[in-house]
Amino acid sequence: MLHFQSLLKSLMVVGISLLSGVPFESIALGSARPAQTPLVTVADLDVGESATLKLHDGTQATVKLLDLKETRDDIRNAVRQAVVTVEVNGKSVSLVSCTYRLPVTFANVQIDCPITKGYLQKSNKENAWGLTKDARLRLWPAGSPWMEPGTFVYPAKQCWFATDTQMANVPTFVDGGEVPANKNIYYHYGLDFGGAEGMVDVVAATDGLVVSSGLEKLPGYDDSPVAPRYDVIYILDERGWFYRYSHLYKIEDFVKPGQRVKMGQKIGVLGKEGGSGGWSHLHFDISCRQPSGLWGIQSGYAFIWEAYQREHHPEIIAVARPHHVAWAGDAVELDATRSWSREGAIEKFEWTFCDGTSATGPRVRRTYDKPGEYNEIVKVTDASGDIDYDFAVVQVIDKNHPDQVPPTIHAAYYPTFDLKPGDEITFKVRSFRTREGSEVWDFGDGSPKVTVQSDGNAKVHDPNGYAVTTHRYKTPGRYIATVRRSNERGHEAITHLQIVVSHR
């Protein structure tokens, strides 16, 4: 281990590192022999600092961090957007850090900015990224995959954006965590995939060695990101990267420390155990040595996007995330520009709002006068007529009564793939920040509404905390199911799900 650490330190020059991998045995035994080299090259820079990097194909790129601007809200003083201006091979480009952004191609490289220093301040997760400078940049050659093909798969057996998600640098919100009085922000650093508790299979994203499973841990990994917990698995791959799978409803019996797993092999079931906040989801993150020499997060959004594309070949993906938080009466800009089509440009953006009005365009501005959790629908259409939907979450709080926060709501369904007319679909819902009222479902097919009642997150880990119902769609189509619940002040939380039913 000491030899491994000294090698890493020798590679750190002005905070720059090609994050080379090592075989499983090296972490425990001290071997420095590379096994699988990541395709990404990483640089941590202060404003005004530059570096020349060698990319994985042998080419070089010179980068300089010119500027960093971080925008904070006036509700929690949380960073809502960070923009770096970077000079790449003599040309300047601005990049938004994470929050559902993908690498961009510019000046013969692909580049992104996964983290900036503002996300580490007043954060309750300390320095999960291992960043000691102003910002981190990641580079790949133009046209390169982001992850070596055949070495990484999507870790949850459900469709893309099946329900709520919390990706990197987004303050956690699904379980009602966006409270004005709470200035200690949990900027999410991993990837949260919401799903139906106890139903969605979780698979190993890579081949790897199980280092910990539940409370059991292999010896020799004290200097590592591994932190055993009853609902957590850590797997080490041949890049020397650690993969964490958290909040599992069940861990498969064979998943024991020292066991090797294959990419795509089922290792557990999605749940809400551990520090889930009470909403059912898979927390997935990747950690590796960073240019600082510290263990830190390797941002995974681009990797899961690429993996899902390879496995499922979607023609179009609507993206209206991340969520928004605003005072009542303030304007909010809804943004679907991160939507994607295999055809190229999106031709139409059509918005349908909770108040029954509508608008068109990739960005729209809205003002909300009443507190609540809104869930605005965007439909995107490309030149081939392919369509997809996503939903923009807007949490609105009364500035005169900031302690009277509105309810929030999480819904999920299963299965999400290969649905046919007549198939039974399970729908689950749980509300947060209220125990008044009931949830009311409208399945979007003209059938009668269904009323259920969750526990309002009274007991976080209650196996019956989600209210459960089932529904069958009679005909093929693309349906938008809606569920809502109000609190004692009449403030409502609304969410939507997109369900695609195909011909038999």
Task: Give residue ranges: language-model regions.
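N-terminal secretory signal peptides that target proteins for export/translocation
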Residues: 1-7
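Conserved positions in beta-strands of structured domains
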Residues: 66, 209-211, 249, 271, ...
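Short, surface-exposed secondary-structure boundary micro-motifs
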Residues: 213-216, 266, 272, 379, ...
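Extracellular/lumenal mature domains of secreted and surface-exposed proteins
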Residues: 299-504
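Surface-exposed, beta-sheet-biased, low-hydrophobicity segments with strongly acidic/polar composition
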Residues: 27-161
